């Protein structure tokens, strides 16, 4: 399978608080790089003889596939969310209030988690726990989680 770089869905020149140069660079280098990297890893996996390949090779490629895939998907969700009004819809507001008490408490915690991401590389996501029936912030390295799909809980927040 070959992955394609999606068209940037917002106009970077019209975003408030983010420079056009920053958005274009992040889109081309980080997102575009993740897609290219995922395609390279996919090609390696397609040509790999799993019956004879050493376990560490399989493990390494599958780990890198997971990281690149999540990076691609999370960047797509991020860029698709830019240019909106920044306010959660009523259903999301209700869910946040139910889980955190009020929007301000959630926003304070969410922003603090973003500032705590070391080196400026990583994500903070608002996810939904089906087990606990609550919204939960998750930070740091969600690239290492099982693959996200637009149908997963994170799509609810885009």
Region locations from a protein language model:
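Feature for soluble, non-membrane regions of globular proteins
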Residues: 1-158
């Amino acid at each position: 399978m070959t992955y394609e770089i999606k068209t940037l869905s917002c106009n970077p020149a019209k975003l408030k608080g983010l420079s056009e140069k920053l958005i274009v660079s992040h889109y081309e280098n980080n997102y575009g790089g993740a897609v290219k990297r995922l395609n390279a890893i996919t090609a390696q996996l397609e040509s790999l003889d799993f019956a004879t390949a050493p376990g560490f090779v399989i493990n390494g490629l599958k780990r890198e596939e997971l990281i690149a895939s999540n990076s691609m998907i999370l960047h797509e969700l991020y860029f698709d969310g830019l240019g909106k009004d920044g306010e959660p819809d009523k259903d999301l507001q209700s869910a946040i209030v139910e889980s955190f008490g009020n929007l301000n408490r959630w926003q304070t915690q969410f922003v603090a988690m973003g500032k705590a991401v070391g080196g400026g590389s990583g994500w903070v996501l608002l996810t939904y726990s089906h087990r606990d029936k609550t919204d939960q912030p998750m930070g740091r390295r969600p690239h290492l989680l099982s693959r996200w799909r637009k149908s997963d809980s994170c799509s609810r927040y885009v």
